[in-house]
Amino acid sequence: MTAISSPINLFEYEQLAKTHLSQMAFDYYISGAGDEITLQENRAVFERIKLRPRMLVDVSQINLTTSVLGQPLQLPLLIAPMAFQCLAHTEGELATAMAAASAGTGMVLSTLSTKSLEEVAEVGSKFSPSLQWFQLYIHKDRGLTRALVERAYAAGYKALCLTVDAPVLGQRERDRRNEFVLPPGLHLANLTTISGLNIPHAPGESGLFTYFAQQLNPALTWDDLEWLQSLSPLPLVLKGILRGDDAARAVEYGAKAIVVSNHGGRQLDGAIASLDALPEIVAAVNGKAEVLLDGGIRRGTDIIKALAIGAQAVLIGRPVLWGLAVGGQAGVSHVISLLQKELNVAMALIGCSQLQDIDTSFLHL
């Protein structure tokens, strides 16, 4: 295979990133749970759906702008929450945040970030407007959750994105085989500043990561959402919904947006692909909350397919990590710009100049 020095698509970024990352880090980022069936399906479903272009439409001016929860975006994508970004580059989440903000798009920061939520917010504050959400869990230690929410609100995050598909960690066999640990010098930056945490001593692994895994709460129910919403006025986004009845219930319990997601295929192997779940969820929500989607986005045409079925925007994950590994902020910026260019070209070729006009008539399902 010819060596790739300047990637021209997201798949080439993945190939090049492998040469920049340790095997343990690459496997952590790329792997799914179990046999990785859901991981593969997230991509395969986009390849199965074909497009039906319209001809002789004026596409001389393509408009990619949209909004999510009233916050403007220059294109319909956000950076998905991803842990441990300093595994890919020393600037980690700071580089990602700078790239997202400079492109006029949004970023969802993971609780398990290796740069603190305050540091990342400061980067975003240099751009106006800047869309940053904070991803979190409701931990067994409610004091930990409360502290994170209060810090996110004080730092200026625009929404709380609650991950609901992780009552326990999925069976990620590559990580087990590699005995995955955080390298020396990397920390869960959002937890190191919280006093009073009972961090276990775990030889050969990160005590903080062990503590976090123990804090996942399999006893959570819908009723716990009321407590979370009482902590701040920030809108609540639920990430990890795959059923229409759950989506309808999310709206009843106050969610302002839903991210249709199977955690990148990293939780329940054999779960439905995100795009396959999207139509039922859009119908169930019926315009009462905004619907977003993550999982499998690699091309501008993929974004069109998700929007046609009813997503307001999409989130991209692993390709951002590949860009980060290859070139830091510049690499992430290039990944975003590649998708933006592909989306712009695809919009012209399907005969549609406005995102709001994309619908299922453009799809061959």
Swiss-Prot record:
Induction details: Up-regulated by high salinity conditions (NaCl exposure).
Binding residue positions for pyruvate: 28, 137, 172, 263, 266
Comment on bound cofactor: Binds 1 FMN per subunit.
Family per similarity comment: Belongs to the FMN-dependent alpha-hydroxy acid dehydrogenase family.
Subunit and partners: Homotetramer.
Alphabetized SUPFAM superfamilies for the sequence: FMN-linked oxidoreductases (SSF51395)
Cofactor: FMN
Binding site for FMN: 81-83, 110, 135, 163, 239, 261, 294-298, 318
EC number from the UniProt entry: 1.1.3.-, 1.2.3.5
Keyword Flavoprotein carried by entry: yes
The keyword Oxidoreductase is annotated on this UniProt entry: yes
Gene3D superfamilies cross-referenced by the UniProt entry: Aldolase class I
Active site annotation, chain numbering: 263 (proton acceptor)
Species assigned in the record: Nostoc sp. (strain PCC 7120 / SAG 25.82 / UTEX 2576)
Protein name, per record: L-lactate oxidase
Xref: InterPro entries: Aldolase_TIM, Alpha-hydoxy_acid_DH_FMN, FMN-dep_DH, FMN_HAD, FMN_hydac_DH_AS
Pfam families: FMN_dh
Domain FMN hydroxy acid dehydrogenase: 2-365
Reaction(s) catalysed by this chain's protein: (S)-lactate + O2 = pyruvate + H2O2; glyoxylate + O2 + H2O = oxalate + H2O2 + H(+)
Matches recorded under PANTHER family: 2-HYDROXYACID OXIDASE 1, S -2-HYDROXY-ACID OXIDASE-RELATED
Gene assigned in the entry: lox
Disruption outcome: Deletion of this gene does not affect growth in nitrate-containing medium under normal photorespiratory conditions. However, the mutant is unable to grow diazotrophically, caused by its inability to protect nitrogenase from O2 inhibition.
Task performed by this protein: Catalyzes the oxidation of (S)-lactate (L-lactate) to pyruvate, with a reduction of O2 to H2O2. In extant N2-fixing cyanobacteria such as Nostoc, this enzyme primarily serves as an O2-scavenging enzyme, protecting nitrogenase that is extremely sensitive to O2, and is therefore an essential partner in N2 fixation. Also shows clear oxidase activity with glyoxylate in vitro, and low activity with glycerate, hydroxypyruvate and glycolate.
Single GO molecular function: FMN binding
Transmembrane segments: none
Keyword line: Flavoprotein, FMN, Oxidoreductase
